C-alpha cells in the first residue's frame, strides 16, 4: 500500500476521508455513532483509505473546523453525520469546493449526495402493525425533530394513524435525544396517564430499555401487558433478539450504512463526472414477541 505522501504526489489526493463533529454531541459515547464509524473505518481500510476525526470544542466553532480542514487539504472528502433539517454544512462545503456525502438527508438547496433509509415507510409499517393488532392508544418516543430522520418517522406514524381514521394524541408524542434514561422518564409519564398507551414505538433499542424499566416498575410486562416496537440499528451491544421478550423492530444496519457511505464517497472521488449518489434503503419490519394485542382484547 503506498504511503500517504506517495499517494499525494501521484494523485493529488491524501487517501483520507474526514468526519467532524461538535464536542457537545458526545458522539464517541453514542453506540449508534460508534457502530457507524466502525463500518466507515472497516470499509475505508479495505479500499486503501483512512478515516480521520476532528472535534469542534471550546471557543472554536464547527464551521471554523470545517474551513480549517478544507484549507489544510488533509482529506479528500468529508462525511456529514447526524444532519439537521436546516443544516449549514452542505452549503458551506459546496462553497468551499470540498466533496462530501451525507448519512441522512437535509433540506439544503445545494446538490447533496446522500445515503438514507426509508424512515417514513418504516414507522408507517410499524404503526400499521400495532393498529392491525387492535391498538389505538399508541405512543411515539422519537428522536430530535430538528433532524430529518425524526421528522420522517413522525410523518410515517401520522400517516398510518390518519390512514386508519385514528386521531393522533399529542400527549403520546415525545421527542428528545435517544437515551435510555430519557426514555425511562418519558415512559413513566406516559404510563401514569389516566388513559395510558397500550403500545409504544421507539426510535432506538436504547429507548426500549428505558420503556421496559418504566413498565416493570408498574408491574407491567412487555409482550403481555403492553406492546413495544423499536428501531434496530443492528448494534453489536444491543440485540433485539436477546431482549426479554424478543423485540419487534424496524431493522437496518448502521454499520453497513457506514461501509456504503465510504464506498459512495470514494466512487465520487474516482469518477467525479458521474451523477451524485442518492440512495434510500428499504427497512425490514421483523415481528417478534413484544407485540401482543391490547391487554383488554
Regions found by a protein language model. Give the residues of each.
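Flexible loop/turn connectors
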Residues: 188-189, 193-297
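Short helix-loop hinge/linker segments at domain boundaries
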Residues: 3-14
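Alpha-helical recognition/docking segments in bacterial nutrient-uptake
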Residues: 12, 16-128, 132, 190-192, ...
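Short, well-ordered beta-strand segments
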Residues: 18-20, 79, 139, 201, ...
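Hinge/beta->alpha junction and helix N-cap segments in small-molecule ligand-binding domains
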Residues: 23-35, 53-62, 115-125, 141-186, ...
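Residues that mark the start of a beta-strand
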Residues: 16, 99, 137, 198-199
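Short acidic capping loops at alpha-helix termini that bridge into adjacent secondary structure
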Residues: 136-137, 168-172, 222-228
Amino acid at each position: 500500500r503506498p504511503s500517504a505522501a506517495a499517494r499525494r504526489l501521484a494523485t493529488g489526493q491524501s487517501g483520507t476521508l474526514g468526519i467532524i463533529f461538535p464536542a457537545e454531541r458526545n458522539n464517541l459515547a453514542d453506540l449508534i455513532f460508534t457502530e457507524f464509524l466502525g463500518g466507515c473505518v472497516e470499509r475505508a481500510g479495505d479500499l486503501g483509505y483512512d478515516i480521520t476525526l476532528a472535534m469542534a470544542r471550546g471557543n472554536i466553532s464547527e464551521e471554523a473546523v470545517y474551513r480549517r480542514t478544507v484549507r489544510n487539504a488533509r482529506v479528500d472528502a468529508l462525511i456529514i453525520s447526524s444532519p439537521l433539517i436546516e443544516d449549514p454544512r452542505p452549503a458551506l462545503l459546496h462553497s468551499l469546493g470540498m466533496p462530501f456525502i451525507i448519512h441522512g438527508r437535509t433540506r439544503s438547496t445545494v446538490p447533496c449526495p446522500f445515503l438514507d433509509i426509508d424512515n417514513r415507510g418504516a414507522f408507517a409499517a410499524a404503526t400499521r402493525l400495532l393498529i392491525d393488532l387492535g391498538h389505538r392508544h399508541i405512543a411515539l418516543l422519537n428522536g430530535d425533530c430538528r433532524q430529518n430522520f425524526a421528522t420522517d418517522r413522525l410523518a410515517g406514524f401520522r400517516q398510518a394513524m390518519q390512514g386508519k381514521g385514528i386521531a393522533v394524541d399529542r400527549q403520546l408524542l415525545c421527542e428528545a435525544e435517544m437515551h435510555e434514561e430519557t426514555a425511562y422518564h418519558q415512559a413513566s409519564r406516559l404510563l401514569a396517564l389516566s388513559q395510558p398507551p397500550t403500545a409504544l414505538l421507539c426510535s432506538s433499542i436504547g429507548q426500549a430499555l428505558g420503556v421496559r424499566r418504566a413498565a416493570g416498575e408498574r408491574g407491567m410486562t412487555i409482550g403481555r401487558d403492553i406492546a413495544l416496537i423499536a428501531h434496530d440499528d443492528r448494534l453489536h451491544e444491543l440485540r433485539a433478539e436477546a431482549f426479554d421478550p424478543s423485540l419487534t423492530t424496524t431493522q437496518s444496519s448502521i454499520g453497513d450504512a457506514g461501509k456504503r457511505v465510504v464506498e459512495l464517497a470514494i466512487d465520487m472521488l474516482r469518477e467525479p463526472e458521474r451523477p451524485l449518489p442518492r440512495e434510500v434503503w428499504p427497512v425490514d419490519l421483523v415481528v417478534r414477541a413484544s407485540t401482543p394485542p391490547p391487554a383488554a382484547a
